[in-house]
UniProtKB/Swiss-Prot annotation:
Origin organism lineage: Bacteria, Pseudomonadati, Pseudomonadota, Gammaproteobacteria, Candidatus Pseudothioglobaceae
Cofactor binding: number and manner: Binds 1 dipyrromethane group covalently.
Organism, scientific name: Ruthia magnifica subsp. Calyptogena magnifica
GO cellular component, one term: cytoplasm
Gene3D superfamilies, per database record: Periplasmic binding protein-like II, Porphobilinogen deaminase, C-terminal domain
EC number(s) reported in the record: 2.5.1.61
Pfam family, one: Porphobil_deamC
Sequence positions bearing S-(dipyrrolylmethanemethyl)cysteine: 241
Matching CDD domains: PBP2_EcHMBS_like
Name the UniProt record assigns to this protein: Porphobilinogen deaminase
Family listed: Belongs to the HMBS family.
Chemical reaction(s) catalysed: 4 porphobilinogen + H2O = hydroxymethylbilane + 4 NH4(+)
GO molecular function terms listed in the Swiss-Prot or TrEMBL record: hydroxymethylbilane synthase activity
GO BP term (any one): protoporphyrinogen IX biosynthetic process
Length: 304
């Protein structure tokens, strides 16, 4: 008997690519399964003239998708994990974390080959406070301008002029076939990635064991540990998108190394710590790192 599964997705090209990728993989694992994409416009997609931090944060990109699952219109939602708030609403859970792709930030420009190559007082576009605080640390002279919209929209804005360069996520550019636009992959030393960057996650209804069984083959265990550590740190710090928090985990030989950062965009103060543990302690590691940052004054920065 054929089964049908409906995926809730945003309408942006990147969101559709990610949902389509999940559809292809699910249908490959389950030949009797038909997967349908249900496209939706979210509040985050509609309000483009204000920074995310001022209009309610990245949760604006997923609320409508969760409502559709709650009503039974759709069965799962596919998200970029860096857009998923650390608190998942009651009645939902993350059912699968997929294998991490390129987690780094990208410098994109039509005229300059790297951030170092930019002239004094160059104009750089980004809407991420995390990127702004780290960019200012390496190039305090730069003029940072707000840049909203999906990947295609941001590239068009760059091409029209007004920016000497823009900062985007490598993963999004690569997924959409824009890898050639990347002039510089920015190292994690210069720009520590966002929590969950480069990772796609699948959200499901909390007690939906049938759906959980269907998506299980897509789970990547190593990435799940990494994202668990990063999100545990973020949750302990109570970090939304209005504060500059970065968290990035790496795994080598069952050891997980987590680097965390909290910054103050006004004063330029940056707190950065790194700790190591066994992968089985991923979540506890995230909490421990957050506590270290708190002991250095992270909460004072986040309050402001």
């Amino acid at each position: 008997m054929n089964k049908t599964l409906k995926i809730a997705t945003r309408q942006s090209p990147l969101a559709l690519w990610q949902a389509q990728n999940v559809k292809i993989r699910l249908e490959k694992h389950h030949p009797d399964l038909t997967v349908i994409l249900v496209e939706m416009t979210t509040k985050g997609d509609q309000i483009l003239n204000s920074p995310l931090s001022k209009i309610g944060g990245k949760g604006l990109f997923i609320k409508e998708l969760e409502v559709s699952m709650m009503k039974g219109i759709t069965d799962i939602a596919v998200h970029s994990m860096k857009d998923v708030p650390y608190e998942i609403p009651q009645g939902f859970k993350l059912g699968a974390i997929l294998k991490r792709e390129n987690p780094f930030d990208a410098f994109v420009s039509n005229d300059f080959s790297s951030i170092d190559d930019l002239p004094q007082n160059a104009k750089v576009g980004t809407c991420s406070i995390r990127r702004i605080v780290q960019l200012k640390a390496i190039r305090p002279d730069l003029k940072i301008l707000d840049l909203r919209g999906n990947v295609n929209t941001r590239l068009k804005k760059l091409d029209k002029g007004g920016f000497d360069g823009i900062i985007l996520a490598c993963a999004g550019l690569i997924r959409l076939g824009f890898e050639s636009r990347i002039k510089q992959q920015i190292s994690d030393q210069q720009s520590l990635p966002a929590v969950g960057q480069g990772v796609v996650g699948i959200e499901i209804r909390e007690n939906d064991t049938e759906i959980l069984d269907l998506i299980k083959p897509l789970i990547d265990v190593e990435t799940t540990y990494m994202v668990s550590a990063e999100r545990a740190m973020n949750a302990r710090l109570e970090g939304g998108c209005s504060v500059p928090i970065a968290g990035f985990a790496l795994i080598d030989n069952e050891q997980i190394m987590l680097t965390g950062l909290v910054g103050n965009v006004d004063t330029g103060v940056i707190l950065k710590e790194q700790i190591l543990s066994h992968v089985s302690q991923a979540e506890a590691l995230g909490v421990e790192l957050a506590n270290k940052l708190i002991s250095l004054g992270a909460k004072d920065i986040l309050k402001n």
